[in-house]
Regions:
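Helix N-cap/beta->alpha junction signal
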Residues: 40, 63-65, 110-111
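Structural motif detector for alpha-helix initiation sites
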Residues: 3, 32-33, 92
Length: 124
């Protein structure tokens, strides 16, 4: 079994079992394996169809700690892509250097970082 199979198998074996709780959300986000796998499948499908992410492409994520990182990690696993987590505590200039080094095909970011992403976009 590889990482891309994990959530799909968990959905088969225990679809209604609580898989994850994101206590950082208001209200608290609780997902079963079935819900979580389908959520990750939607992201993987979007990455593939819209962002044209494929095998060995890098997908960068700029977000605070939360389920979004795990969604991205498992979606990348389903596609054979490389999950590239960016440290949200870095200054946008440091993130530019990381992006130039890793060359991600797409950057996923949370609304908290829209100003930084605008600066990053201008700099690249």
């Amino acid at each position: 079994m590889y990482i891309g199979d994990y959530l799909g198998r968990r959905e088969i074996y225990s679809p209604d079992t609580l898989a994850i709780i994101d206590a950082g959300k208001a209200p608290e986000l609780r997902l079963t394996f079935k819900q979580w796998n389908r959520r990750v499948n939607r992201l993987a499908n979007w990455l593939s169809a819209t962002a044209k992410v494929g095998f060995r492409d890098r997908v960068a994520i700029l977000a605070r700690d939360g389920i979004e990182h795990l969604d991205s990690f498992y979606a990348c696993g389903k596609l054979g892509a490389i999950h590239t987590a960016l440290n949200w505590r870095l200054h946008w200039r440091e993130i530019v250097a990381l992006i130039e080094d890793t060359q991600p095909k797409v950057l996923i970011y949370s609304d908290d970082f829209i100003d930084s992403v605008r600066e990053i976009e201008k700099a690249i």
